[in-house]
Amino acid sequence: MDRRHEKYDRLIERCKQNEPVPCAVAHPCDESSLRGAVEAAQMGLIVPILCGPRARIAKVAADCGLDISRFEIVDAEHSHASAEAAVRLAREGKAAVVMKGSLHTDELMAAVVNRDTGLRTSRRISHCFVMDVPALDRVLIITDAAVNIFPTLEDKVDIVQNAIDLALVLRPDRQPRVAILSAMETVNPKVPSTIEAAALCKMAERGQITGGLLDGPLALDNAVDLAAAKIKKIDSPVAGQADILVVPDLEAGNMLAKSLTFMAEADAAGIVLGTRVPIILTSRADSLIARLASCAVASLVAAARRAQATKAVS
């Protein structure tokens, strides 16, 4: 086991215990997206349904030496049609997961959020990075760094709840510790994120957010480092040992996630929640292990939802 990726390796091994889930891959028309889907299938994580221009997908596979003969292809003329086809498969119950291929995130999300034909639910849609940071002994969830640009307090309630629900799937034996981040750990009327952090914590106390332990505002250092929390004399079950970092806005979250990736050798698996099915958002810069981990996370979420639905009707 590669110690740098040991947390991802454990997730992938756990996922292999389940049946592979049908996954609609939207426009896998370059090597990285097609190879990621094929290798995830070879590891037993997903059963890909390739949505895109048939001839173009076949050419990429031939050029890269990838065998896609056993995978279904849903022919779609262009990237917009590929996104719509993948979403349609999810709506029809033929796919339990949707994966982004070589199209722009906005193209896929436009199909996802369509009020008539998309995958909306009563929840706010949000994104979670599931990060394997070598310096930490646990997987770290960062939200929201990709979908909600300037979320309101109301938006953040769903963002936090989506992240807690994800953490409980990944670690059912551990109550998630949620740090609501700001630039400081005291409430300052001049810094709106500190007021929202305090409000979210009170909402959790009142049962408006469930399943996790919340604390905030917390600065990044005293959210993830026990020594920093002790120096600041912050006494809470979250400080220094957060599993989830809730950022004030997309800009802060994106910079935090990319800083960990490019300066701390972390890998970032990405998943969108608050939709009918989990959606894997990958980047062309993602490593293969990050792509596989994204598939594993989405597969575990899909399996948990399937088990919950079965329990509800039994």
Regions found by a protein language model. Give the residues of each.
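Anion-binding alpha/beta catalytic cores of soluble intermediary-metabolism enzymes, centered on
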Residues: 1-49, 53-238, 243-314
